[in-house]
């Protein structure tokens, strides 16, 4: 019998409960995020313990994001062609093996920074597929009226695990033994694979009934009959025609350059300016997570109250404020609060972005459209990680944060009117095909 994950007194499909299928997907996402968070914190600590070179530290972040540039797009095609549940199990199993090798090497004294880079590359290649498949499965098991709440739960669970729990835990485990965070990471991926295996049903888009193919994009296709490039072009061209989704994708790619750059050298800022050790550095991520948790709890109600338009606009201001704080403050408490506020913004932004994409995108294209967004975001992540080390080495540790502030202010000024109330209202109304058609280039949507 399906267990209840959450229920609110709503009408229509908004009153439908999120059942045990979503509960298992949420649990898998959360436990996997815990493991990924352990590696995210432990990797720069591992490199910094062996070399104080900012380039080597930021390179760990760059290597982690490089697979997103190489494999995000074909990964989306794969998600749209095969059973998403089975694919996620296979990927998690591969990640267990990779992290197990790294943990064993560190614990036996046979480690190297090069091996860490290789494992990060493999694990994050799998993360691409898992992220796209998981987002698509949310749309499979959750009715449209509950997407904001479901995405809030997914983001809240992942944020709690990856930052609130993983940060301090990784710092503690690293002090006990450098290989322990990576060993624990392998165990979480194994648990995730088991949980996904318990989800009932088939999740291959081509065999589901009610497959939606947008007008003008060709007749319904059979998986495998078209080339990967044709599938990629179909998903990309559809996204390009959707003004709102296209703008959000480009915007997050640009902002990720400065944000990832800021986070790539945060370990050095924490040590040199804030006087924090490994546990204190992890606590900064806990502040970020606390904000994310608050955002996930109040997200669907806050977005409904203040509107998606102002949720996004205020979030852009918060982003600018974060960079300014990191550039000027010497107080660990002020920095912690800034990260907390950014955590709230980050969760609210992601809820809006994911829910809009799941609403507007035809089911058979969710993998490709989602992976295209991930590719654009990853481009910014990788560029930011690569640039931050060089900028910090040349101009000082605060230089990446000043650059981030300037970019964030410029983005606020140039995109303020894009997220109008009329565009958002149209996106939340009607069927996915109708809403997407209304928001395509050429459709009337006055900015307000």
Predicted regions and their residues:
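Alpha-helical transmembrane-bundle signature of multi-pass membrane transport and export proteins
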Residues: 1-448
């Amino acid at each position: 019998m399906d267990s209840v994950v959450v229920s609110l007194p709503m009408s229509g499909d908004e009153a439908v409960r999120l059942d045990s299928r979503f509960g298992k997907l949420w649990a898998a996402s959360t436990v996997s995020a815990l493991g990924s968070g352990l590696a995210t914190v432990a990797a720069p600590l591992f490199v910094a313990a062996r070399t104080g070179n900012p380039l080597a530290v930021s390179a760990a972040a760059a290597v982690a994001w490089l697979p997103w540039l190489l494999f995000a797009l074909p990964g989306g095609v794969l998600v749209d062609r095969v059973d998403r549940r089975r694919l996620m199990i296979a990927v998690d199993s591969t990640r267990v093996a990779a992290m197990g090798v790294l943990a064993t090497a560190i614990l036996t004294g046979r480690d190297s920074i090069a091996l860490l880079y290789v494992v990060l590359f493999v694990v994050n290649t799998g993360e691409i597929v898992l992220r796209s498949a998981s987002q698509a499965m949310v749309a499979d098991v959750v009715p449209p009226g509950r997407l904001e709440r479901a995405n809030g739960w997914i983001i809240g669970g992942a944020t709690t695990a990856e930052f609130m729990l993983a940060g301090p835990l990784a710092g503690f485990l690293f002090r006990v033994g450098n290989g322990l965070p990576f060993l624990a990471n392998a165990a979480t991926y194994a648990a995730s694979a088991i949980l996904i295996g318990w989800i009932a049903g088939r999740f291959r888009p081509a065999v589901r009934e009610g497959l939606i193919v947008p007008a003008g994009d060709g007749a319904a296709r059979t998986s495998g009959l078209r080339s990967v490039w044709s599938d990629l072009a179909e998903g990309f061209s559809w996204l390009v025609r959707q003004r709102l989704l296209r703008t959000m994708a480009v915007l997050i790619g640009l902002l990720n350059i400065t944000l990832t750059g800021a986070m790539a050298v945060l370990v050095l800022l924490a040590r040199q300016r804030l006087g924090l050790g490994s546990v204190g550095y992890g606590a900064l991520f806990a502040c970020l997570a606390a904000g994310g948790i608050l955002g996930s709890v109040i997200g669907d109600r806050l977005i409904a109250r203040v509107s998606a338009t102002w949720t996004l606009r205020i979030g852009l201001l918060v982003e600018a404020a974060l960079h300014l704080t990191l550039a000027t403050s010497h107080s660990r408490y002020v920095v912690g609060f800034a990260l907390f506020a950014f955590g709230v913004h980050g969760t609210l932004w992601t809820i809006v972005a994911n829910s809009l994409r799941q609403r507007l995108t035809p089911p058979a294209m969710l993998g490709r459209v989602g992976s295209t967004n991930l590719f654009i975001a990853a481009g910014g992540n990788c560029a930011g990680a690569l640039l931050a080390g060089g900028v910090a080495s040349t101009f000082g540790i605060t230089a990446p944060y000043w650059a981030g502030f300037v970019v964030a202010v410029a983005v606020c000024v140039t995109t303020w009117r894009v997220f109008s109330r009329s565009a958002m209202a149209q996106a939340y109304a009607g069927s996915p095909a109708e809403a997407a058609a209304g928001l395509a280039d050429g459709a009337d949507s006055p900015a307000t």
